[in-house]
Amino acid sequence: IFQKAKNEGNGPKRSMIFLNVSGEEKGLLGSAFYVKHPFVPLKNTVANLNIDMIGRTDNKHDSLKIKDYIYVIGADRLSNELSEINKKANSDFTKLELDYTYDNSSDPNKYYQRSDHYNFAKNNVPIIFYFNGAHDDYHKPTDTPDKIDFPLIKKRAQLVFLTAWELVNRSERIKLNK
């Protein structure tokens, strides 16, 4: 499908890698392996958009009866430009509440360090971690597919796609913070 779109002139200007890794719960093993053995040199990696748990809502938002949100973590830590691209994609299209509650270096949950984007960030690759927050089934066998909110995951995935699409079609790569 992607090759057909590219052949018809609708492809991105830059390459995209869709990377599925495992071993997160055992110490981010898959992403640690990848950054040591990347398909392309990490210096050529513009950004890492990490989607880790985006199909549900957390207890906080459930109690407020708010569904159209996503936690955004780390977007401006290495590149303010990346954060602005994400905000613009959201304001222009998806209009989710971007919740930065966990985007504080002193957050006791330390979510910034607990998902696969972290190995990229440690290697100076700008990241965004998209997360729906913890819920009662977090890291339990009871976290089953029937509990996914498919219209919501679609909207959140659209935000990730639109951010990625802007990144791969810009005339210049995003700049790192000084």
Q: What are the residue ranges of the model-derived segments?
A:
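Metal-dependent peptidase/peptidase-like ectodomains
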Residues: 22-129
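His/Asp/Glu-rich mid-to-C-terminal helical/loop segments that flank catalytic regions of hydrolases
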Residues: 3, 131-178
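Alpha-helical metal-binding/catalytic segments enriched in His/Glu/Asp
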Residues: 1-27, 160
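Structured segments of extracytoplasmic/periplasmic soluble domains
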Residues: 1-8, 37, 88-96, 123, ...
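Proline-rich low-complexity regions
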Residues: 12, 41, 126, 173-174
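Glycine- and acidic
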Residues: 16, 67-71, 141, 145
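Generic anion/oxyanion-binding catalytic loop in active/binding sites
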Residues: 7, 109, 149
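Surface-exposed patches in mature extracellular/periplasmic domains of secreted proteins
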Residues: 7-11, 96-104, 171-177
